[in-house]
Amino acid sequence: MESETVLYSADFCCDDPFLRRGEIFSDITFYPYPGGLFTYIEKYCKIKKDFNCIYNYVYTCLQYRGDYMSELLRVENLHVAVGGKTLLHGINLTVNTGEVHVIMGVNGAGKSTLLHAIMGNPAYEITEGHVYFEGEDITELSTDKRARLGIFLSFQNPVSIAGITTENFIRTAKTTISGKQQRLFPFKRLLKSRMEGLAMDPSCGDRYLNDGFSGGERKKSEILQMRILEPKLAMLDETDSGLDVDAVRIVSRNISEFHNENNSLLLITHLNQI
C-alpha cells in the first residue's frame, strides 16, 4: 500500500470579484484525520458577511490507487432556478472517484440547491449548464434514473412515508438499483448488521419509513440506506445537524466505513468533526 497523499483545493461561487483562490487557501489549515479519510479544517477563511459564498473543500486519499483518479461527476456552468428565481449562477465542480468534497457556506448560499439539482429534483430547474456522471450527460435524466446510475442524496429534513416499512423500502430500492432480487434472509442479516453499527433500535426496520422517528433516527435512517445501497456518489445534506455528540460520532464512523477508492462523497456540513 502506498503512503497517504493529501490533495486539497477550494472553489467558490459568488459575485465578489475581490475574493480569490489564494485568499481562501491562506486562512485554511488541512490535517489528515486518523484513518486517512477525512480532513479537519482548522478555521474558515474570513469573508464579507454580505456575500453569499459556497466553498468546496476537497480531500483526496490516494493510499489505494496511487495518483490515478477517474472523473465521476462534472458540473459545468450550472444555473439553477426555483420558482422562477435563479439561485445558482455558473457553478463548476468536478468530483473524481475516491474523493471526499466538503461544501461549506452561509445559510442561503445555495448548497442544498446544488445537491438537489445534481439529483434531478424537478423543483430545481436547470436553466443553463450540464451535469455529467461517468462521462454521460444526465442533465435531462429523471431522479429515479440518476439513482439507478448510483447517485444518492441524504436529505437535510428526511420525510416520512407511511405504508411501507423501512426494511421493505430499502430492500425494494436495492433490488431496483442493483437489478438483482434481494433474498429475504441474507438481506435481513445485512440490515440487522448495519442497524447495529448505527446503534438503531431494531424495531425501526419494521416501522414505516421515518414515521414517528426522532430527528436522530431519521438521520441514521438515511445513513442506513447509504450503507446498504452502496452508491457510487453519496451526497449528504447536513446529516450531522440536530445530532448529539454520540450520534455524530456514530454517523461519522459509518461515513468513514462507507467511503473507499471506488466511491465518492459530497458533504454539506457546518461541523469540522464530521
Question: Which sequence ranges carry the predicted segments?
Answer:
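Helical segment within the ABC ATPase nucleotide-binding domain
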Residues: 248-261
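H-loop/switch region of ABC-family ATPase nucleotide-binding domains
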Residues: 268-270
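Walker B catalytic motif
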Residues: 238-239
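The feature captures the beta-strand-to-loop junction immediately N-terminal to the Walker
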Residues: 104-106
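Q-loop/switch helix immediately C-terminal to the Walker
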Residues: 157, 163-177, 190
